[in-house]
C-alpha cells in the first residue's frame, strides 16, 4: 500500500528545491539517511545532509554533513577501526571520509576514479551503501559517459580495508534499454540509490529516465569478480 503523504520534505533555504536521492544505512537500531539537499541558487547548490530514524517514518534532522557542492553519499554499515565511514562524490570520482561522531569528517580520499574513453568517463557516484558479502563489499555505482547516458556498474571493495577497490567489472551491469528508461524527464538514465538482498537474491531498485521506478535482480552467487 502506498502512503498518500511524503515521509520527508524539504525545509529551509538549502532544501528549497528539494530533497533527493536518499541512501539508507542501518547501524545498530538506527537508520541513517544521507540525501541531497538542493537549494536551487545554482545548479551546483547541492549539499549532503543527514537524518536518522528508528521506524523510517519519524525523522530527526542532523543538517549538512559536508558544506560543499557534493552528493551521492552513504554510510558503511560497519565501523572501520572504530570510525564511521562515509562515501561521497567530489566530481568526478567516488571518495570516502571518516568520523568519530558523524559530525566532523576527515581523511578524505579517492576510492575509485573515472575511466577515460568509455561508459564511465564523465563521472561516477555511489548507487547505495556497499553490501557485505563473503568476497568483500559489493559496491554498485552509476557512471555517465560523454553522451550523458547513465548506467550502473559494480565493484568489489576490500572487506578489511574498504578504501581499496579489489576489482571493478569492465562492463555495466545495467543500462537504459527499455522505452521508459530511454524516454522521460531525463532520457537514457538508470539511477539507483538502494538495493535489497532477500533469499540470496539481489534486488536493485532504480529510476528510469528520472520518471518511473524499476527493479532488476540477480542471484548473489552469480556475481563473480
What are these regions (language model features)?
Residues 1-17, 25-122, 131-188, 199-202, ...:
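Beta-rich carbohydrate-recognition and catalytic domains
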Amino acid at each position: 500500500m502506498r502512503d498518500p503523504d511524503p515521509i520527508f520534505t524539504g525545509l529551509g533555504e538549502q532544501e528549497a528545491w528539494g530533497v533527493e536521492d536518499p541512501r539508507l544505512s542501518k547501524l545498530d537500531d538506527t537508520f541513517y539517511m544521507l540525501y541531497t539537499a538542493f537549494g536551487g541558487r545554482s545548479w551546483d547548490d547541492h549539499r549532503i545532509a543527514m537524518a536518522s530514524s528508528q521506524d523510517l517514518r519519524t525523522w530527526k534532522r542532523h543538517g549538512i554533513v559536508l558544506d560543499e557542492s557534493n552528493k551521492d553519499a552513504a554510510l558503511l554499515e560497519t565501523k572501520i577501526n572504530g570510525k564511521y565511514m562515509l562515501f561521497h562524490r567530489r566530481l568526478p570520482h567516488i571518495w570516502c571520509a571518516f568520523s568519530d561522531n558523524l559530525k566532523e569528517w576527515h581523511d578524505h580520499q579517492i576510492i575509485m576514479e573515472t575511466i577515460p574513453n568509455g561508459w564511465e568517463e564523465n563521472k561516477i557516484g555511489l548507487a547505495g551503501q556497499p553490501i557485505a558479502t563473503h568476497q568483500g563489499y559489493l559496491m554498485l555505482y552509476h557512471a555517465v559517459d560523454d553522451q550523458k547516458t547513465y548506467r550502473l556498474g559494480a565493484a568489489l571493495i576490500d572487506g578489511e580495508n574498504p578504501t581499496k577497490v579489489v576489482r571493478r567489472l569492465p562492463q555495466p551491469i545495467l543500462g537504459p534499454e527499455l522505452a521508459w528508461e530511454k524516454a522521460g524527464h531525463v532520457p537514457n538514465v538508470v539511477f539507483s540509490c538502494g538495493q535489497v538482498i532477500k533469499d540470496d537474491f539481489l534486488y536493485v531498485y532504480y529510476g528510469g529516465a528520472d520518471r518511473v521506478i524499476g527493479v532488476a535482480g540477480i542471484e548473489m552467487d552469480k556475481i563473480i569478480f
